[in-house]
A protein has these predicted regions:
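Alpha-solenoid HEAT/Armadillo repeat architecture
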Residues: 103, 176-179, 254
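Catalytic loop of the DD-peptidase/beta-lactamase superfamily, centered on the K-T-G motif
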Residues: 46-123, 266-267, 307-472
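Secretory targeting and sorting signals
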Residues: 1-51, 58-61, 65
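Active-site donor-binding loop signature of nucleotide-sugar glycosyltransferases
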Residues: 125-127, 296, 399
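Active-site SXXK
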Residues: 98-99, 112, 118-120, 141-168, ...
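Hydrophobic/aromatic residues within well-ordered alpha-helical segments
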Residues: 90, 94, 148-151, 245, ...
Length: 472
């Protein structure tokens, strides 16, 4: 996520898995979107110091809080499992908090789904199309950015369960051409600790994507942008959110699965998980019905409709599409390991520090103060899908913009405010992005990608390169 402050409109506006672009503000943001493709680790996904200025007293922040301002005396307390009962009063507080974030951030529309043992919450706010004023609706399809990484990681782990690959095998045993591949393991790629330079931080990539959002990239072309740079760190030594890792894992899935990555993920993950509204696109077409997505990752920095931009630049790091109901279901399936052997899921859940307090990253998922899952951001869209195991509760949200608010991913702000009310002892929190996300806007691939620290760029990353990152 870029920390650069961008002009905001007075009216709501609606991904950016890749995140900011190069030196010019518009390009910088565009690059961020591509890199973002992260989701939850939006702050971590940034790779560089923030050059933007934040308001002295922002009304909304993503800072952790023991209690939300809207969760005061007289409100029901969290039960032993960590979530509050969804009483009419709590529901009203959630409505008010979501409306407040929607208004203050200028997000066009958002879908929010919550499932707890004591009740459910499924509501839409704002508009799905700023031109027609069509209301946002839970049935609509939106791009999910870096949530895609959770599907790619699951596909790899299905191959582990089938005995076709080992997590500690060198990637060179399966994928040719990876610099230093003999010393980089499959596990390190999934944990964002390969040390490779992220392709979505390369200025040439960012410029190509921002100036031609319908450009069709091949996986090898994407990786080539990163491979021309030296490694950022030795394998296994530091966390750096990096879309390149998940493009390489996509190639591994194709090699061992014997099918195009999207087809394998559909057959081995989407279908077994019974996600009837989730898909891996092969072009820029959106399945109907869908919400339009809005971004400022453009050459001029002007807001544009990114709905049908080609997601090939994000591929297995952030190209997928889903609905809020499917994300609710997927968050539980992913966090509980329903598609994997228990021992394999246990390996996936071994999270390591990211540099952000309370946030650890495992094999294609994070633990954010107890919430297990991921976030995503790419030009036009952002998402969060997380599960709180001890409370058997799920939170999923989707919004149709990736435009940052005072340096923060709007999806993180919604999740933060919601969990302050829903689970005050487990508040979802990601610091504002420092400069540019480490993945193109996406998600997902939104959200989260740290460098040497979760919010800063690795010391070895060229300073001129950090702002030219696209989020995913």
């Amino acid at each position: 996520m870029t920390k650069t402050r961008r002009p905001r409109q007075a009216v709501p506006r609606s991904i950016a898995v890749p995140r900011c672009a190069a030196t010019p503000r518009p390009v910088r943001r565009a690059g961020a979107a591509a890199l973002a493709l992260t989701g939850l680790l939006s702050a971590a996904a940034c790779s560089g110091p923030s050059s933007g200025k934040q308001a002295a007293e922002p009304v909304i922040t993503a800072e952790p809080a023991a209690l939300s301002p809207s969760y005061g005396s007289g409100s029901p307390s969290a039960s032993a499992n960590g979530v509050v009962p969804l009483t009419p009063d709590v529901t009203a507080r959630l409505d008010a908090a979501i409306q407040r974030v929607l208004s203050q951030t200028g997000v066009p529309g958002v879908n929010v789904g919550i499932i707890t043992p004591g009740g459910t919450y499924l509501k839409s706010f704002g508009v799905a199309d700023k031109t027609t004023g069509t209301p946002m609706d839970p049935s609509l399809h939106l791009r999910i950015g870096s949530e895609t990484k959770t599907f790619t990681a699951t596909a790899v782990l299905r191959l582990v369960d089938q005995g076709k690959v080992g997590l500690d095998d060198p990637i060179s045993a399966y994928v040719d051409g990876v610099p230093g591949g003999d010393g980089i393991t499959v596990r390190q790629l999934g944990e964002m600790r390969s040390g490779l330079f992220p392709y979505s931080s390369d200025p040439d990539f960012v410029n190509t994507l921002i100036n031609d959002p319908n450009h069709v990239f091949t996986p090898d072309q994407l990786l080539a942008y990163g491979y021309k740079h030296p490694a950022v760190s030795p394998p296994g030594t530091q966390f750096q959110y990096n879309n390149s890792n998940y493009i390489i894992l996509g190639k591994l899935v194709e090699k061992l699965g014997g099918l195009p990555a999207g087809r394998f993920i559909t057959d081995q993950v989407i279908t077994p998980a019974a996600l009837g509204q989730t898909s891996f696109p092969t072009d820029g077409t959106m399945p109907s019905p869908y919400a339009h997505g809005y971004t400022e990752q453009t050459p001029s920095g002007a807001i544009a409709d990114a709905t049908n931009w080609n997601p090939s630049w994000a591929w297995t790091a952030g190209a997928m599409i889903s609905t809020v109901a499917d994300l609710e279901s997927w968050a539980r399936t992913m966090a509980t390991g329903a598609l994997l052997k228990p021992a394999t899921q246990a390996e996936r859940l071994k999270t390591l520090p990211t540099g952000d307090p309370g946030v650890g990253y495992g094999f294609g998922l994070f633990d954010n103060n107890g919430w297990i899952g991921h976030n995503g951001s790419l030009p036009g869209y952002e998402s969060v899908a997380v599960y709180l195991p001890q409370a058997q509760s799920t939170l999923a949200l989707q919004l149709n913009t990736d435009v940052l608010y005072q340096g923060s991913e709007p999806s993180s702000l919604f999740a933060n405010e919601i969990t302050k009310i829903l689970s005050p002892k487990h508040v979802y929190s990601i610091p504002p992005a420092s400069a540019a996300p480490s993945t193109p806007a996406s998600g997902s691939a939104s959200g989260p990608a740290p460098g040497a620290t979760s919010t800063g760029s690795p010391p070895s990353l060229p300073a001129s390169n950090s702002p030219s990152t696209v989020r995913t």
